[in-house]
């Protein structure tokens, strides 16, 4: 996948998601002693907390200092604020009133924050917390998941996850895994949305057990 162009990856994703949709209509969960197993109807992605330190002009980013409502006239690199808008939170170089993060509030506003948190205020735990869509018909908030996937397990080092977050752009069959704090992989195309510490973009062959 890493060698695909952005357009090729987008087409590949759409094809795979279409296959998952069909499978989700046909496959039922398997009830076992530990919980319920869903065989290959979900796909996994990663999201992260971008660090301001990675958004420099030397790396090709638009580092023009700008401010926005909620930032009390403090200025940050333009591309960093765009990344915070997409990911939800960002780690700043210098704390403001002991707060080391900013968060996207919607409606063009940001706010300073103590930590990246999930839907109900739980602090996100790297390689443990994950997000699902509010339209997911199979999983619920606060569910504990065991994800069996070579890609997920090798790239994140974890197979146990806790649902505590959501996102407007998350697909109903998507499980978005929280990577943690990191600098972006690069300034071009989809590299902007990828943490530097992993090559993972998508994992489609996943088996999910919802633990009791």
Segments predicted by a language model, with ranges:
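Short, low-complexity, charged amphipathic interaction modules
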Residues: 1-21
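Solvent-exposed, well-ordered loop and adjacent helix/strand elements within mature globular domains
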Residues: 21-212
């Amino acid at each position: 996948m890493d060698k695909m162009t952005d357009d090729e990856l987008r087409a590949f994703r759409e094809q795979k998601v279409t296959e998952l949709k069909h499978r989700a209509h046909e496959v039922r969960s398997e009830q076992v002693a530990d919980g319920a197993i869903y065989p290959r109807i979900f796909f996994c992605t990663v999201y992260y907390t971008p660090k301001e330190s990675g958004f420099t002009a030397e790396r090709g980013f638009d580092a023009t200092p700008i401010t926005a409502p909620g930032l009390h006239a403090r200025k940050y690199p333009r591309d960093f604020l765009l990344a915070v808008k997409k990911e939800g939170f960002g780690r700043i170089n210098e704390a403001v009133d002991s707060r080391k993060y900013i968060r996207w509030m919607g409606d063009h506003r940001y706010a300073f924050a103590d930590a990246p948190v999930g839907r109900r205020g739980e602090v996100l735990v790297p390689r443990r917390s994950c997000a699902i869509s509010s339209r997911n018909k199979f999983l619920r908030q606060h569910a504990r998941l065991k994800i069996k996937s070579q890609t997920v397990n090798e790239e994140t080092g974890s197979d146990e996850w806790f649902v505590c977050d959501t996102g407007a752009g998350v697909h109903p069959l998507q499980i978005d895994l929280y990577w943690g704090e990191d600098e972006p992989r690069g300034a071009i195309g989809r590299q902007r949305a990828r943490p530097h510490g992993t090559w993972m973009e998508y994992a489609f062959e996943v088996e999910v057990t919802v633990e009791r």
